[in-house]
């Protein structure tokens, strides 16, 4: 559609699809605004900056991704019918996906506040918006005056029938064994995030290399847009470093700081570093000129941080020795305990060095699944992994609330474990795994993966294979790359990469890579993945010593499950008016009941006895009448020809007046009274029509043989009816007045057939 606004547009063909980058139509007062479109999916990304009154000591970047429900022609399901409240889990994860590749690319020393907003304003439910938002953020920053050293582009890699697909459609993703989001610059990959179905390391590397080449047109398009509308970048004046103070700090601290950084224990090392800082400050404050510097404490802290980085990295590169004394490939000591929580369905305590995670698995019913409102409609999740990082895990005091980091780590661990879970209806339970970080000194999310796998096996969940994960680090100096296995928290902070890789012995199930340098060659990634495989196999071997396979039975405290198939016509009866019947079953048994339109009823109960009771109560509403069986029913209607008796829920039988008693009955109401119980025998089933007899029951009670072939004939001699004289003009009425060949009073009497 041709715009009447003065817009500038460029495009690139990537993965066989045109991706449009446009600016000038919307949000022109933003410092940078780009409309990114692929098919019918459109994301508007804006970038704005403003100076701060004082230096915060860090770069204040905020990224928020939002999905507007109108984009898919939907109205929000909230009470106020608008997008309010906290972001959804997906919105949080995509916000992180945008943040991670762009954050390292801001010019060093730039400390102004920056806000990136990505709003999905059109969604065709075919082309995913997340990778468009990554590219849009880079484009908005690139054309803005914000000092950003991009561009980068984002794309998703799929693999269908062994062939790589770039930016696959949502339909293609259903058949893909790979789903990796990559962000890359002209020269190298800067971010990786995704999941795989037991894919080998070499395939992952090949996918990254292939995708890096394929997304280059998006880099070209952004450079073209910069040429057309790009603004001059803001000048960044890096803070002037006090060389004299830096030299003095190094002189005072180097020896003792190096010794402190050789202490293996995290908290002892932290205390020693703190003591070094205090000693240095004490010596410096003795100088009256320095004592007047209000920022001395922060400046010294920054200088000591830089010195720590130099000392640690130099020792690793020159000596091959890390902070805790390990070489570059050794995994920290592993300790595992399974089943330590007596009433939990499954539990495991996984410890790797000073990182420890208590992971608990819980089985629930299908009604416990998570239902989410999204652009593609209502989405249901039957597996959830929640990662918690309480402040006590690192000896700190903080507000205890779920952070974006916790959501991101939980999502990564969830991706890692999902491929090994039962994929069919044979395992109908909802699963929730909670990873409580007890201690943290690096790689706590991968501890959640290992502990999560063990807790599921402890619960008896039939996973196809154990899963383990490890975090890899990197030291890069003067073109030399050194990969570190199982990094510590300090190595994460002082190093150049955090590359988390999880999988089974067969292959990879989840990856996540963040770097602090401008890019990473794929051959270095290949080396890191090969080294990670060695570590993963070692960890899996340690896990197998404690729990080699899932327990043969589910936890006795897990819900008991049964499936019942009922006639779909009785579903409304099982539910009852206003849910009366199903609520009664739930109240009596404590069971959770899920009924499908097909007639499949899933029962989840706290005990086996409760499950059986719930099953019987459900089946009670789906009973079929049996010929010759006695039933105690309620009289629902009294008619001229007899009574209607409800012998089973919503199943009624006609008791003809001739079958109400062993003696002649003149009026049905003499025997049958509305709402009273009546015991009857089913004597005929003809499709949906059922006939029953009270007389047959009475005869059986008297020990008199009842002849089902003569259901209308009363027992005993007929009553003396006296001389009734000539009835005149009515002819032969076909035998016995009480039935005989008349077929009972239900025959054709010229009143519309059977009068049931």
Curated annotation (Swiss-Prot):
- The main enzyme category here is transferase
Alphabetically ordered keywords of this record: Cytoplasm, Magnesium, Metal-binding, Nucleotidyltransferase, RNA-binding, Transferase
E.C. number: 2.7.7.8
Question: What does the UniProt entry say about where the protein is found?
Answer: Cytoplasm
Which SUPFAM superfamilies does the record cross-reference, listed alphabetically? Answer: Eukaryotic type KH-domain (KH-domain type I), Nucleic acid-binding proteins, Polynucleotide phosphorylase/guanosine pentaphosphate synthase (PNPase/GPSI), domain 3, Ribonuclease PH domain 2-like, Ribosomal protein S5 domain 2-like
InterPro entries membership = ExoRNase_PH_dom1 (IPR001247), ExoRNase_PH_dom2 (IPR015847), ExoRNase_PH_dom2_sf (IPR036345), KH_dom (IPR004087), KH_dom_type_1 (IPR004088), KH_dom_type_1_sf (IPR036612), NA-bd_OB-fold (IPR012340), PNPase (IPR012162)
Q: Which residues bind Mg(2+)?
A: 492, 498
GO terms assigned for molecular function: 3'-5'-RNA exonuclease activity; magnesium ion binding; polyribonucleotide nucleotidyltransferase activity; RNA binding
Q: Does the keyword Magnesium apply?
A: yes
GO BP annotations of the record are: mRNA catabolic process; RNA processing
Coarse class of the primary localization is: cytoplasm
What cofactors are annotated for this protein? Mg(2+)
* UniProt domain KH: residue ranges: 559-618
- Provide the residue span(s) of the region labelled Disordered: 703-756
Q: Which CDD domains match?
A: KH-I_PNPase (cd02393), RNase_PH_PNPase_1 (cd11363), RNase_PH_PNPase_2 (cd11364)
Basic and acidic residues compositional bias, start-end: 718-756
Which HAMAP family does the record match to this protein? PNPase
Q: What does this protein do?
A: Involved in mRNA degradation. Catalyzes the phosphorolysis of single-stranded polyribonucleotides processively in the 3'- to 5'-direction.
Give the family this protein belongs to, as stated in its UniProt record: Belongs to the polyribonucleotide nucleotidyltransferase family.
Task: Provide the protein name.
Answer: Polyribonucleotide nucleotidyltransferase
């Amino acid at each position: 559609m041709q715009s009447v606004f003065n817009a500038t547009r460029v495009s690139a063909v990537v993965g066989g699809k045109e991706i449009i980058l446009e600016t000038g139509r919307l949000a022109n007062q933003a410092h940078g605004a780009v409309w990114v479109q692929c098919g019918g999916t459109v994301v508007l990304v804006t970038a704005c900056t403003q100076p701060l009154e004082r230096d915060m000591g860090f770069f204040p970047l905020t990224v928020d991704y939002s999905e507007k429900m109108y984009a898919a022609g939907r109205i929000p399901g909230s009470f106020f019918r608008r997008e309010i409240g906290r972001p959804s889990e997906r919105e949080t994860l995509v916000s992180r996906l945008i943040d991670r590749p762009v954050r390292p690319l801001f010019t060093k020393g730039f400390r102004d506040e920056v806000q990136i907003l990505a709003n999905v304003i059109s969604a065709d439910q075919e082309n995913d918006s997340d990778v468009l938002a990554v590219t849009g953020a880079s484009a908005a920053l690139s054309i803005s005056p914000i000092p950003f050293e991009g561009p980068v582009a984002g794309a998703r890699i799929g693999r269908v029938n062994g062939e790589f697909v770039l930016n696959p459609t949502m339909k293609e993703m259903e058949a893909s064994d790979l789903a990796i989001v990559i962000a890359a610059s002209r020269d190298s990959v800067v971010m990786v995030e995704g999941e795989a179905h037991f894919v080998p390391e070499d395939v992952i590397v090949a996918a990254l290399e292939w995708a890096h080449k394929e997304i280059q047109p998006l880099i070209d398009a952004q450079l073209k847009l910069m040429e057309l509308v790009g603004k001059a970048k803001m000048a960044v004046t890096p803070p002037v470093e006090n060389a004299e103070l830096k030299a003095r700090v190094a002189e005072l601290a180097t020896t003792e700081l190096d010794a402190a950084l050789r202490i293996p224990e995290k908290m002892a090392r932290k205390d020693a570093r703190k003591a070094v800082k205090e000693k240095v400050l004490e010596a410096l404050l003795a100088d009256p000129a320095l004592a007047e510097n209000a920022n001395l404490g922060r400046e010294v802290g920054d200088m000591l941080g830089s010195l720590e980085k130099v000392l640690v990295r130099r020792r690793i590169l020159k000596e091959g020795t890390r902070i805790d004394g390990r070489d570059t490939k050794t995994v920290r000591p592993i300790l595992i305990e399974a089943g330590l929580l007596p009433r939990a369905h499954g539990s495991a305590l996984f410890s790797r060095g000073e990182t420890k995670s208590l992971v608990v698995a819980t089985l629930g019913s299908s009604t416990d699944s998570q239902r989410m409102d999204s652009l593609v409609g209502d989405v249901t999740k039957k597996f959830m992994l929640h990662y918690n990082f309480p402040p006590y895990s690192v000896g700190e005091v903080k507000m205890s609330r779920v952070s974006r980091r916790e959501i991101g780590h939980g999502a990564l661990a969830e991706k890692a474990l999902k491929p090994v879970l039962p994929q069919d209806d044979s395992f109908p339970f909802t699963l929730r795994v909670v990873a409580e970080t007890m201690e943290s000194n690096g790689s706590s999310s991968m501890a959640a993966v290992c502990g999560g796998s063990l807790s599921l096996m402890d619960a008896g969940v039939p996973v196809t294979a154990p899963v383990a994960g490890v975090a890899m680090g990197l030291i890069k100096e003067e073109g030399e790359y050194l990969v570190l296995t199982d990094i510590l928290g300090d190595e994460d902070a002082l190093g150049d990469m955090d590359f988390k890789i999880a999988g089974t012995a067969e292959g990879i199930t989840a990856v996540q890579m963040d770097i602090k340098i401008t890019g990473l060659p794929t051959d270095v990634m290949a080396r890191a993945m090969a080294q990670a495989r060695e570590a993963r196999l070692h960890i899996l071997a340690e896990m197998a010593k404690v729990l080699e396979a899932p327990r043969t039975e589910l936890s006795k405290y897990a819900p008991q499950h049964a499936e019942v198939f009922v006639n779909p016509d009785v579903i409304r009866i099982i539910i009852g008016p206003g849910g009366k019947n199903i609520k009664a079953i739930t109240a009596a048994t404590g069971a959770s009941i899920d009924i499908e339109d097909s007639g499949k009823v899933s029962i989840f109960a706290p005990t086996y006895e409760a499950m059986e009771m719930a099953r019987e109560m459900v089946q009670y509403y789906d009973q079929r009448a049996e010929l010759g069986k006695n039933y105690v029913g309620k009289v629902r209607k009294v008619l001229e020809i007899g009574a209607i008796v409800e012998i089973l829920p919503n199943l009624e039988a006609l008791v003809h007046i001739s079958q109400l008693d062993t003696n002649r009955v003149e009026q049905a109401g003499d025997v049958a009274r509305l709402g009273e119980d009546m015991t009857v025998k089913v004597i005929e089933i003809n499709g949906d029509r059922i006939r029953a007899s009270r007389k047959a029951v009475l005869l059986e009670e008297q020990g008199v043989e009842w002849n089902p072939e003569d259901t209308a004939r009363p027992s005993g001699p007929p009553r003396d009816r006296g001389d009734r004289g000539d009835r005149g003009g009515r002819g032969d009425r076909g035998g016995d007045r009480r039935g005989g060949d008349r077929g009972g009073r239900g025959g054709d009497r010229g009143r519309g057939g059977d009068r049931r």
